[in-house]
Amino acid sequence: MDVQFKKMQGTGNDFIVVKYDDFPFEEKLSQLAEKICDRHFGIGADGLLIVNPSSIADIRMDYYNSDGSIAAMCGNGIRCFSKFVFDEGFLRTKQFSVETLDGIKEIAIIEEKGTVKSVEVNMGQVTYDTEKIPVVSEDGYFINKKITVGGQDFIITAVSMGVPHVIIFTEKLDLEQIKFFGPLIEKHAIFPKKTNVNFVHRIDKDNIAVRTWERGAGYTLACGTGSTSAVAVANKLGLVNNNVNVEVEGGNIKIKIKESGNLFMEGPAENICSGRFFFN
């Protein structure tokens, strides 16, 4: 069957967007994600976004990693999703709510000259609760603790931003090392559901650089929940202020920490192409 899709990207993190009405086979969505996201035999993307109606919010987003696994939340993905539903006329207002497996997220569309310039998302707060992340620990938190993988020690902090994240501060962002150690940390025994891995370089109080190895997707050019988690941890440790620019390989993301403690992420969302994918 032919599946109508749109391909989008947010700071280099790319996604395929499909309306559920165009593929109403929930039991086959994981298989669709694997096939359509394949960069050699499919369209190619980091993940699949499904547009669904919601009974508790204005609309619902379901997200599948490129390996077919389900993720509760995707920061760059929800920006692309929000631009899609706004541009396609699903919602007429610039502020709306999106249901995710990580709860309801509040969205603000930012336009310039009649086109969507960027999207702001209320990401909520990170949790350090080891049971909710989850991570195996004798304490109720996992902050600045040592683990050893591949013969090398790392000081890590584990949090959840709807999905599990590890934050590692480093003086140098070495892509070769990130791609080697990333999957080893992702699958470390202390993470029963695996984890995303973020290598973070602090530039100054207002700027950091983040490189992410994503659970279920591998190395990506950006990770919204990872960037948000990195700022939250850096702020908690006194390394950055409340308004931080995050440099990722695919561009820049702005993270603001409000008085409530909620983290707001703002970044671009752009169309790449649209078409029909033959699925069998």
UniProtKB/Swiss-Prot annotation:
Entry annotated with the keyword Amino-acid biosynthesis: yes
Domain of life: Bacteria
GO cellular component: cytosol
Recorded GO MF terms: diaminopimelate epimerase activity
Reaction catalysed by this enzyme: (2S,6S)-2,6-diaminopimelate = meso-2,6-diaminopimelate
Pathway annotation: Amino-acid biosynthesis; L-lysine biosynthesis via DAP pathway; DL-2,6-diaminopimelate from LL-2,6-diaminopimelate: step 1/1
Active site: 74 (proton donor), 223 (proton acceptor)
Main location as per UniProt: cytoplasm
Annotated site, Could be important to modulate the pK values of the two catalytic cysteine residues, chain positions: 165, 214
InterPro entries assigned to the protein according to its UniProt record, in alphabetical order: DAP_epimerase_AS (IPR018510), DAP_epimerase_DapF (IPR001653)
Binding sites annotated in the UniProt record for substrate: 13, 65, 75-76, 196, 214-215, 224-225
Subcellular location: Cytoplasm
Key words of the record: Amino-acid biosynthesis, Cytoplasm, Isomerase, Lysine biosynthesis
Biological process terms in GO annotation: lysine biosynthetic process via diaminopimelate
EC number, as in UniProt: 5.1.1.7
Summary of subunit composition and partner proteins: Homodimer.
Similarity section: Belongs to the diaminopimelate epimerase family.
Protein name per its UniProtKB record: Diaminopimelate epimerase
Native species: Alkaliphilus oremlandii (strain OhILAs)
Gene for this chain: dapF
